[in-house]
Amino acid sequence: MSTAEASATTADAAEAGGRTKTGSPRTIPVFGVAIPDGEMQGIFKPMDLNRIIKVLEEEDKDVSEEKQLNYIKKLIHCYQNGFPLRDLAQIFKILSLCAEKIEKQPCFVEPASDIIKLCGLPFLKKKVSDEITYTEDTANSFALLGELMKIPSSALRIQICKCIVDFYHAEPLKKHIPGYQQVSSSYKIKMVEVGGLAKAMVQSALLLENQLVEKLWVLKVLQHLSTSGVNCTLMVKAQAASGICAHLNDPDPSGQLLFRSSEVLWNLLEKSSKEEIIQQLSNLECLLALKEVFKNLFVRGHSHYERQLRNDILVITTIIAQNPGAPMIECGFTRDLILFATFNEVKSQNPLVKSLKLFNCYEDFELKKLLFNIIVILCKDLATVQLLIDGKVILALFTYVKKPERLKIMEWSAAQYEELQLHAIATLSSVAPLLIEEYMSCHGNSRILAFLEWCGHEDSYFIHGNSFHGTGGRGNKFAQMRYTLRLLRAMVYLEDETVNKDLCERGVIHQLIEIFKTMMSRPAEKEEAIALEIQSDTLLILSGLCENYIQRKEMFGTEGVDIVLHVMKTDPKNLQRGLGYNVLLFSTLDSIWCCILGCYDSEDYFLEKEGIFLLLDILALNQKKFCNLILGIMVEFCDNPKTSAHVNAWRGKKDLTAASLLIKLWRKEEKELGVKRDRNGKIVDTKRPLFTSFQEEQKTMPLPANCPSIAVMDVAENIRAKIYAVLDKLDFENLPGLSAEDFVTLCIIHRYFDFKIGEIWNEVSEEIKLEKLRLVTTDEKSLNSIIAATENIGKMVASLQSEMIENQALQDVQNEQRVYAKIQATHKQREQANKSWENFLARTSNAKTLKKAKKLQEKAIESSRYTERPQNATFHQTVIKGLNTTVPSGRVVTVQSTPTRLLGGPLADTDIALKKLPIRGGALQRVKVKPPLNDPKKSIPT
């Protein structure tokens, strides 16, 4: 296709006239810009690019070299303001032809360089859609730039590098070209990624080992390319990391090689797969180069730039050291790093550091922290231990474990020294457990306890707390105490008797209890998380010291029990606030196990202070993470004869008892494990009553004798065995506060041990079948008898459960009947009272009704008399003369006809009176009984 402007204008007119492109799967909107032909002629002269290509391809003697160069010069002059995207493919074809001629015709170097130089200018687009339309052409053109780096021409290579660098520093066009727009710089960068230019540049860098200038330009290009994650991935595939790192120490008076190489390595680590980069750098060649560079910068680097570069190299080394396969020891780098880390604290005769000194500047301060950090990483390789001993690392680090001396001239500022002190203590936590003999020879325990004592005192020493390790320690010594306790915990949990015995002889138990009390007495502060960690570590250290030692448990004593009880009284809501409280509670439960259980005095004091109640309160919170540990403690505590009374006396919410709580936990555990039970909690499978869903999924397979089976592992993996043990020690027969549902579950718990034995024998039987073994007759009978006995126990328990469920159902029916009977009696009583009231109203309002009632009353009285009158008996008339009212008119009525001894006193009990309604009707009243006149002292007013 001709790229002459006339042809281009004709093509544009044809496209604008309605021709649709079919090369793309989707329609791309095309926008044309109409401009006068005169203006176009002023910018781009007609140029037949196909003609130029044809001329360059001809090898006839008729076509002179001068003619070819003239065509190229015209091309360069025509496109002096930049290349249009639509012509890019043909222009790079011309560039490729020029490059092919360079080897035999060096005169083509200059025009090729000029074309490449123009590529550094912004590309031009005539339509908005050009960026999409010519994507492939542009990407292929940039890929060709990478291929041209193989041409042995220094000028051409440098020009290519300058061109690529210009992609990242694009400047706007100096002259506006009508009808064209500048392509954005991001488009070029994107096309570089698509074209894979980064990979080609890495390959060219590996070829330029002896050409320093060209190599520096390539590194500059790679420095720009490595800012993209896509390019970094391509560079990693081309082994850029190892190739660049291996030549870090190449001669370079300018110092640019080291700077640019380290910058590229940094970008690769940040923007691509770190694991793959580490793998590439973990070879002897790369580490030797890093070692020499670091040593030179450490010993001879004095400028700010050199110190900063030294620290960057150390960070890269630290990342490589995380790979266990890196030959850090073999190349001697580990020994040098240990020397550099300790020479300031432990004097060394090594000529490398004999006259060396660190200064109070930011770079040297950062270097010191980085050296502490890399020691922590290096010590993970046990082969480093001897080097740490030779380097006296423990002694060097312990120089920081002391209170600051005010009058001594310090190499570091107060804030810097504080941060280095915390780094050193944190490093000791990793190194000291590996070097116990060196730790003891440096009197490590004595130094730590003395420093802890200083941390516990309040004085005017001001803590800055302005570092990662100093978090939460501003204005106090929490940070120092926190890291010192971490160090002490690391040493105690080695379980080395020499270390622990020495600590106990120095009074560490009492000192730790005092530290905990001090933390308890402090008001709630912003550093709550730090305070919780300090308390947790204190309890863990005490647990590590006291476990299995009765004398140390006695030293823990009542003061220790008091701090444990204090933590257990924490508001349960705090457990929902974060990890700190959970860790503290775990540490507390661990200290109960290690520091209290087994010491009878401490156990009794714990019980006396209602410690069991607090344990059950925590258990009732239904926090699964605590249940296993608490139940284990309960099992051990129940060996104390005083525990049962405390457990049975405990009451939770809604009068919940300990036994009922344990049974509820059992039911919840079985539900989570998928044990088969019916809706009433009854056994479903009498052959395997304890089987979980996991056990059913697992197929039985023959196991070695020393390997526990699934049934045995089940005992350790859930809390059912512990619940059984606690209830067994509490006595199954005398458990208070149980419901019928609890009793149904209790039947299973009571037989847990029998069922578990049956499970194991079932496994034995299945394994025998799988291995196709045949038992002798007596053994086979015994095995079958055991399995049958287990099944019979299951049937018996199921039968007992059914009986309990039926009895409970009957009891529920009877209770319901009693309730309904009471309701019916109440209604009947209410109806009788209403009827009595209606009769009363009728008698008072109707004379006939009153007369009728009077006749009924008289008839009732007469019918109640004896038919034969007794001798000497007093006869009372039914009708009393002078009585003109049918109801009492006052509050007091005097009854003179009936003696008090016959009535049994005043009718003051209304409920009793209601049981037998008066025949006379009317409202019930209290009456005053008036005795005869001859006994006035016994009259009782009511």
UniProtKB/Swiss-Prot annotation:
Name the UniProt record assigns to this protein: Cilia- and flagella-associated protein 69
Keywords: Cell projection, Cilium, Differentiation, Flagellum, Olfaction, Sensory transduction, Spermatogenesis
Entries under PANTHER family matching the protein: CILIA- AND FLAGELLA-ASSOCIATED PROTEIN 69
Source species of the chain: Mus musculus
Tree of life domain: Eukaryota
Function as written in the Swiss-Prot or TrEMBL entry: Cilium- and flagellum-associated protein. In the olfactory epithelium, regulates the speed of activation and termination of the odor response and thus contributes to the robustness of olfactory transduction pathways. Required for sperm flagellum assembly and stability.
Stretches with biased composition (Low complexity): 1-16
InterPro entries per record: ARM-like, ARM-type_fold, CFA69, CFA69_ARM_dom
Coiled coil: none
Subcellular location: Cell projection, Cilium; Cell projection, Cilium, Flagellum
A matching Pfam family: CFA69_ARM_rpt
